[in-house]
Amino acid sequence: MGTFKIYPGKLKGEVKIPPSKSMAHRGVICAALGDGISKIRNINYSDDIRATINAMRSLGAIITKEDEYLHIIGIKSEKCKKNIELNRTIDCNESGSTLRFLVPISCIFEGSSRFIGKGNLGKRPLDTYYEIFDNQGIKYSYKKGKLDLRIQGILKYGEFKLRGDISSQFISGMLFTLPLLEGDSKIIITTELESKGYIDLTLSAMSDFGIEIINNNYREFIIKGNQTYKSIDYRIEGDYSQAAFFLVADALKSEVFINDLKLESLQGDKEVIEILERMNMKIKNIDNSLLGIPRENLEATIIDGSQCPDIIPVISLAASLCNGRTEIINVGRLRIKECDRLSAVASELNKLGANIIEKEDSLIIDGVKTLKGGVKVWSHKDHRIAMMLAIASTVCMEPIILEDYECISKSYPEFFDDFKALGGNFHEWNLGE
């Protein structure tokens, strides 16, 4: 267990935002499903991305890390056709994306697949896939409370009815898979679709790799079978979910110029800009760098988090220091992330002096003038909680003690290097101090 003592103090300088984890998952998968050689550039080797890379290796792709790019020989190439393991084990580590994207993909190959992982991954629901398996006669078994899923059987093309309010990852997983089947398929969305931005990223990546899908207003998707993922040179853009931490730091009167973001991005987490602007912050594009310029006071607002769940922890920090009451609604899905993020946000920020009431599907946040600090807080072993608390420390009255900070390696291993380069003041802390 790693523990940091982090001191108050504003951040100042420039930061290059790491490449988008969401886009990297998609780029690696599309390239690995291809029939030739692809190069993925500007990729960050976080724990989650390593899990997806290793998963695609288990399915037969030959993937090599070069100095400037990730070199991928696709599964459909002649070189890889005999490379797939018939009885394969796919270790997803703690990556929900790896698990939910790869489960249906694994069902296009002969043999059996065993999915394992750690942390809270075994608690994330997979009922959507179990229903498909039951309908198609695919054999599977699992253990409750831990990830140990075994699957044997071939997925067949057809019509699939999926809920849109559980996780968009199920829809993306099926979208990746169905173009490779022999016949045509249709996905029908039976509820309101949450996290549309993630579906847009999936469709965009697949289009870049030559796959055609008809999107009928997110109510249904028409997928032609027998398609081929082409091999391309693919560059990953900067990650808005990570930029959100430094934009909120700017909202709290730091001065961080944020580089390497695509302004016309499809990322759903780009909504952080619109949310902060509603909170009375001005965001400027200065020589292709974003800088948040806070006005005198941040103002409360109502935030629908259904389309941007990953930025809700750090947005909750900003809301804690707004004038008035902020309501963050439609965020019940945050309870089944790396931890129960609604509970973690409320409990840890309240320790610092915030005033947050946790509801089943929402957070009610009454703004306070200052955060006191001077206490021990816990990341809940969740990367986004850890980084949010580090940003919170910059405006506390007293230092904080952050336990289990290493979980940042899941998405942003260099976070504390960047935090330090911007003037963040922290050191390892031992219980004896």
UniProtKB/Swiss-Prot annotation:
Active site: 310
Keyword Amino-acid biosynthesis: yes
Superkingdom as given in the UniProt entry: Bacteria
Enzyme Commission number(s) of this protein: 2.5.1.19
Pfam families linked to this entry: EPSP_synthase
Binding site for phosphoenolpyruvate: 21, 96, 124, 169, 341, 384, 410
InterPro entries: Enolpyruvate_Tfrase_dom, Enolpyruvate_Tfrase_sf, EPSP_synthase, EPSP_synthase_CS, RNA3'P_cycl/enolpyr_Trfase_a/b
Keywords carried by this UniProt record: Amino-acid biosynthesis, Aromatic amino acid biosynthesis, Cytoplasm, Transferase
GO MF annotation, one: 3-phosphoshikimate 1-carboxyvinyltransferase activity
Catalytic reaction(s) noted: 3-phosphoshikimate + phosphoenolpyruvate = 5-O-(1-carboxyvinyl)-3-phosphoshikimate + phosphate
Disulphide linkage map: none
Gene Ontology CC: cytoplasm
Annotated GO biological process: amino acid biosynthetic process; aromatic amino acid family biosynthetic process; chorismate biosynthetic process
Keyword Cytoplasm recorded: yes
Recorded family membership: Belongs to the EPSP synthase family.
Name used for this protein in its record: 3-phosphoshikimate 1-carboxyvinyltransferase
